[in-house]
């Protein structure tokens, strides 16, 4: 990792927050299709952010999450299950953090790094989830694409992070589990680290991926050598 790093910027959904925990908490009610429904919900949520961006038809991420869940429930014939959609949406506001998230953020902050989130989520849903997971106590900043009314991986989002944090692209370590996000961030000029929990193959090879680890806990050893530069 380069010596000039000043900020560690994290994606939220899928990186720090487990997007599948909402369905898993309600798995008994959802039934045998719980895992598949959760995967489809996430896929459509992301797809809708990209298609709306291309069509210049912005809607905030909470609305996209709602629309994606509607489709997923219809797909698995659960749309008439009384109260299920409301319970799943409420659970999404309180997603579980990955077990190693808080400790990793605390170590980085103690070492002098600016610790921030850059997310497609709108502020209300982000703040609710971060408060529920207690990650809000560790962050220096939480930046939302909703401020610009566009979604990652548009390069303007990554520039927005630089402007708000007062750093240059080469001074940012950007951490995400999402390959498409890292593709955009890497092409913009961030130093990128992929949290590849599922061991997925490389993607977006036109954009430089600096490092890959299997968990958030592996991030600290990767960055520890730079602590004197960050402080």
From Swiss-Prot:
It is an enzyme of class 3 (hydrolase). InterPro entries: 2-HAD, HAD-like_sf, HAD-SF_hydro_IA, HAD_sf, PGP-like_dom2, S-2-haloacid_dehalogenase. Its EC number is 3.8.1.2. It catalyses: an (S)-2-haloacid + H2O = a (2R)-2-hydroxycarboxylate + a halide anion + H(+); (S)-2-chloropropanoate + H2O = (R)-lactate + chloride + H(+). It comes from the Bacteria. An (S)-2-haloacid binds at residues 12-13, 42, 119-120. (S)-2-haloacid dehalogenases may be used for the biodegradation of halogenated substances and their derivatives which are widely used as pesticides, herbicides and other industrial products. GO terms for molecular function: (S)-2-haloacid dehalogenase activity. Catalyzes the hydrolytic dehalogenation of small (S)-2-haloalkanoic acids to yield the corresponding (R)-2-hydroxyalkanoic acids. Active with 2-halogenated carboxylic acids and converts only the S-isomer (or L-isomer) of 2-chloropropionic acid with inversion of configuration to produce R-lactate (or D-isomer). The gene is hdl IVa. The active site is at residue 11. The keyword Isomerase does not apply. PANTHER family: HALOACID DEHALOGENASE, TYPE II (AFU_ORTHOLOGUE AFUA_2G07750)-RELATED, HYDROLASE, HALOACID DELAHOGENASE-RELATED. Belongs to the HAD-like hydrolase superfamily. S-2-haloalkanoic acid dehalogenase family. The record marks 15, 152, 158 as: Important for catalytic activity. Residues 176-181 are annotated as: Important for catalytic activity. The keyword Magnesium does not apply. This is (S)-2-haloacid dehalogenase 4A. Keywords: Hydrolase.
């Amino acid at each position: 990792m380069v010596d000039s790093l000043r900020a560690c910027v994290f994606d939220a959904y899928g990186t720090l927050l487990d997007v599948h925990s909402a369905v898993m908490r309600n798995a008994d009610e959802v039934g045998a299709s719980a895992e598949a429904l959760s995967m489809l919900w996430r896929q459509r949520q992301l797809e809708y952010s990209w298609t709306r961006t291309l069509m210049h038809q912005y809607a905030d991420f909470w609305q996209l999450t709602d629309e994606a869940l509607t489709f997923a429930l219809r797909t698995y014939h659960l749309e008439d299950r009384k109260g299920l959609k409301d319970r799943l949406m409420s659970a999404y506001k309180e997603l579980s953090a990955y077990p190693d998230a808080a400790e990793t953020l605390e170590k980085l902050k103690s070492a002098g790094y600016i610790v921030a989130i850059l997310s497609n989520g709108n502020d209300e849903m982000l703040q609710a989830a971060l408060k529920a997971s207690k990650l809000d106590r560790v962050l220096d900043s939480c930046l939302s694409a909703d401020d610009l009314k566009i979604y990652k991986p548009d390069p303007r989002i990554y520039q927005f992070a630089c402007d708000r944090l007062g750093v240059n692209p080469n001074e940012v370590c950007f951490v995400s589990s999402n390959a498409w996000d890292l593709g955009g961030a890497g092409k913009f000029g961030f130093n990128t680290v992929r949290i590849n929990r599922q061991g997925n193959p490389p993607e977006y090879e036109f954009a430089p991926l600096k490092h890959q680890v299997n968990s958030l806990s592996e991030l600290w050893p990767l960055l520890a050598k730079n602590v004197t530069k960050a402080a």
